């Protein structure tokens, strides 16, 4: 009897939630996820030692949310970008602001100047606002290819994902994910011209532009291939190719800006190399897999790639939608070519939010609840093991 009552209550709650407007559904799910995340941050804060980010004193809550790369964004708001690249004692380019994109710190800096509120307070607030907008955009995108209940479940999985804790910090992930979701929504609905400003702002927020350009190439070739079954009128041809070309240009705005301001053509590349000590193409994945798993490493890497392809193209990926599948492959190619596996890997997977629909395909409430509980536990580990700094130094999450 008790089990029936609990099941009835769960169904009633779900039905009530699904009767709300779409934006309200996303807001409720997002709000619950942020309450959980902020609670986890407050728990871990109790164990955070004083750091240089908090002037060698126990950090306040907002200072804690401003650790790691969030401090680089603050420096952009305070100092701008360097015109002369800083150098290490060995003569290599040192870590500097050029590795971080300007949109988030610019918005927060403007608000700080207008209101007088401290940057460290405003930055996570701005992140929360953009993350809410992202939740709404993602839910609308998911609903284009899945029923309302499973689309909402997928949205919940996105915002309970372990690295989604970063949406509550001074990082620019929330800003980038919002404009990415908006761009994909525009492309999926064939509103290519509306996607242009969204892609521009996305590329000013996060380095997603190269991956988006790969995606647009896949998308455009697919539109040509399928033009017999899906009409591809001249206006859509012109608009879609305009978006594709502009996507390539927007993707290099940050490197171009670094070149123009410093006078050094490879300023951006050398700045990126300051974090890893090198820049490689694809071989960095083989190197990392071998380092951690020995000769099993490349085999494990191949298995992961095959699982990704099967999960996306197989029956489990039926709710992802063609546009999101194309972006997932474009982004996966980008990661394999240019990204070096490190402590930031989970965070770099956030743009692949479409994969949440693989798990959301199940109609089992038990499976969904188990996934959300598991993600919550992993989020606590992400905050305590990666976000919390054990002085004197560490690696960014």
Identify the residue ranges that each predicted region occupies.
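Membrane-lumen/periplasm interface segments of specific transmembrane helices
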Residues: 36-49, 213-318, 322-328
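Extracytosolic helix-loop segments that constitute the early lumenal/periplasmic catalytic or substrate-binding loops
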Residues: 53-60, 65-93
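Loop-to-helix entry region of an early transmembrane alpha helix in multi-pass inner-membrane enzymes
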Residues: 92-98, 102, 106, 114-133, ...
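Transmembrane-helix motifs of polytopic, lipid-linked glycan transferases
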Residues: 109-110, 122-145, 309-314
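Transmembrane-helix signature of polytopic, membrane-embedded enzymes
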Residues: 118-121, 139-160, 178, 326-328
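Membrane-interface transmembrane helices that cradle and orient dolichyl/undecaprenyl
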Residues: 146-148, 183-194, 363
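Short acidic/glycine- and proline-prone juxtamembrane loop motifs at membrane-interface regions
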Residues: 169-175, 345
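Membrane-interface alpha helices of multi-pass inner-membrane proteins
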Residues: 180-185, 193-220, 246-250, 333-334
């Amino acid at each position: 009897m008790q089990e029936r009552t609990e099941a009835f209550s769960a169904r009633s709650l779900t039905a009530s939630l699904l009767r709300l407007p779409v934006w309200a559904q996303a807001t409720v799910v997002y709000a619950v996820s942020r309450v959980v995340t902020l609670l986890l941050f407050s728990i871990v804060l109790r164990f955070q030692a004083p750091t240089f980010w908090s002037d060698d004193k126990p950090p306040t809550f907002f200072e804690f949310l401003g650790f790691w790369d969030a401090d680089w964004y603050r420096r952009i708001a305070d100092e701008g970008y360097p015109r002369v690249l800083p150098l290490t004692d060995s003569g290599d380019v040192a870590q500097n602001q050029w590795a971080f994109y300007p949109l988030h710190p610019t918005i927060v800096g403007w608000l700080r100047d207008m209101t007088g509120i401290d940057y460290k307070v405003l930055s996570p607030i701005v992140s929360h606002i953009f993350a809410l907008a992202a939740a709404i955009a993602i839910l609308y995108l998911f609903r284009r290819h899945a029923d309302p209940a499973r689309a909402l479940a997928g949205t919940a999985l996105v915002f309970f994902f372990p690295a989604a804790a970063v949406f509550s910090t001074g990082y620019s992930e929330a800003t980038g994910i919002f404009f990415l979701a908006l761009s994909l929504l525009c492309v999926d609905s064939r509103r290519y011209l509306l996607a242009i400003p969204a892609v521009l702002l996305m590329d000013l927020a996060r380095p997603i532009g190269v991956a988006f350009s790969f995606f647009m190439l896949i998308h455009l070739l697919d539109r040509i291939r399928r033009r017999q079954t899906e009409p591809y009128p001249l206006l859509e041809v012109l608009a879609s190719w305009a978006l594709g070309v502009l996507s390539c240009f927007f993707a290099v705005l940050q490197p171009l800006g670094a070149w123009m301001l410093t006078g050094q053509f490879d300023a951006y590349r050398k700045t990126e190399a300051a974090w890893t000590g090198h820049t490689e193409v694809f071989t960095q994945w083989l190197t990392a897999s071998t380092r951690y798993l020995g000769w099993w490493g490349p085999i494990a890497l191949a298995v992961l790639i095959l699982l990704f392809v099967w999960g996306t193209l197989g029956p489990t990926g039926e709710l992802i939608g063609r546009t999101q599948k194309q972006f997932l492959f474009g982004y996966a190619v980008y990661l394999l070519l240019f990204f070096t596996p490190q402590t930031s890997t989970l965070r770099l997977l956030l743009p692949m939010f479409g994969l949440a629909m693989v798990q959301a395909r199940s109609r089992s409430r038990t499976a969904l609840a188990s996934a959300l509980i598991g993600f919550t536990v992993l989020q606590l580990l992400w905050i305590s093991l990666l976000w919390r700094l054990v002085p004197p130094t560490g690696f960014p999450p």
